[in-house]
Amino acid sequence: MFDYLIKNGQLIDGTGSPARRADVGITDGKIAAIGDLSAAQAGTVIDAAGKTVTPGFIDIHRHADAALFRPHFGELELKQGLTTIVNGNCGLSITPCSGPYRGEIKAYLTPVTGELSADADCSSMQAYLDAARRQPSPIHTAMLAGSGTIRACAAGFSAPTLDAAQLRTVQSLIERELAAGALGVSLGLGYAPDCFYSTETLIEALRPLQDSGIPITVHMRQEGSGVVGALREMIAVARALRTPVEISHLKSIGKANWRSCTPEMLRLMAEARQEGVRIACDVYPYTAGSTQLVHVLPPETQQGGMEALTEHLADPAFRETLKARMLTGSDFENISLLAGFENIVVSSVRLDGLRQYEGQSIAQIAEQQGKDPFTCLFDLLQAAHCDVTMIDFIAAEDDICDILRDAHSCVISDSTYPTTGMLHPRVYGTYTTLLEHFVREKQVLSLEAAVHKVTGRPAAVMGLRTKGVLAQGMDADINIFDPAQIHTRATYQDPAQFSDGLDTVFVSGQPAILHGALTGRKDGTVLTR
């Protein structure tokens, strides 16, 4: 006697194997049996005839560190089939946020994570995870230890180099956060203060992970004209530490780099794997990204934190030097040069007096104001104390297709959760966009391959041994849907719209969505290493 019996569905098990007709029995939150269960009995029987049954989807790259404490958290995730997410990415985890630099850390993270609830203690990974366990959730959540936050906790944003004591503090904090349950360590080498690491010091800072098998995820030092060199750096890190490295949201920014850098990077990773280096990548299925607007500036400008940068922007000489560097610089991720100000859209500004600019490009705002785009950009950042996010149109869909086809890639969203303004549509629509656009419309992947990239593959990357595959004894996180009915409603103009098509979603063996409707159940857990 099962608790639930899913009958007559086409089962895609998450391994990449072909779909097959099979029934699934669920008992006590686990998959109790798979096969011909036509003679079995259950408390509830769900007829999945004409539908596909898959593992629940797993997003190993979100920034919902603070959002999980908000009302209605998990609903938009469930509506696109997500049952597990991993936060703390890009080196920007919300923990450890303590000590003399706590205010600077919070100010830096807020455009990405949004405001943190007073109920959440983010002083350490242990305190944060304890708070998360007290917060009922409809989906499973896990954390990475953010290297940038750890370095900022140890030395702030002003130190371009670390002394021996500070380096030991960083290593100690990494060990502490991992011991508390972080699944791995994330790097944000395109952000302060991680961007101040040399390759050699970075390897030393990460020495606690050597030979551990614990994953390192990385937003590379740049994704523009120097992206291939940035990848070579991470191959060197993976080789030195002998632990897995996952390149986050692989892309090549700027038309000058499209269709050349991405194939080369895929080749370099394949060659490294042949040599025994454990390195792979993930990708989001959109040509636009989203992050802090300060990311268009050279990374050294973030030294000292956001208030220091705000003060510097009041200096005309600083602005002139900055403009000259941005007009020609190729030694950093020069988004304004590579993509153009017309492709940099202000998506959220926390200061009410500036929110009229949300949804407009820097080029459009500059034209309205009668300013050149650099002056417009600097004025906006200064007035908003740098608390601005952007949506930047930077990548090529053909490059995305190449990465999707790579056998070692998985799909992520890189969703940020600012508490004001416009979200990127990927927050609501990444997983249905993959199935609707790249599987059904473009046929870049088979349905089985796509499901593997959002279930079995990400589970393996993060060491989630009981998730990602439909097999006896695995956790009963399960999606049921008709692939022909999957549809993404979220757009750049109207991003906060639930996706269609997820008929039933099980979390921990209980229905979080039943017949297309959210049930309100909160059976998610906090996952730890």
Residue ranges, per PLM feature:
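Histidine-rich, glycine-flanked metal-binding segment
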Residues: 1-56
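Acidic, glycine-enriched loop/beta-strand segments at the rims
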Residues: 11-23, 388-394, 400, 442, ...
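Short acidic, glycine/serine/threonine-rich loops at helix termini
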Residues: 95-102, 152-158, 199, 228-232, ...
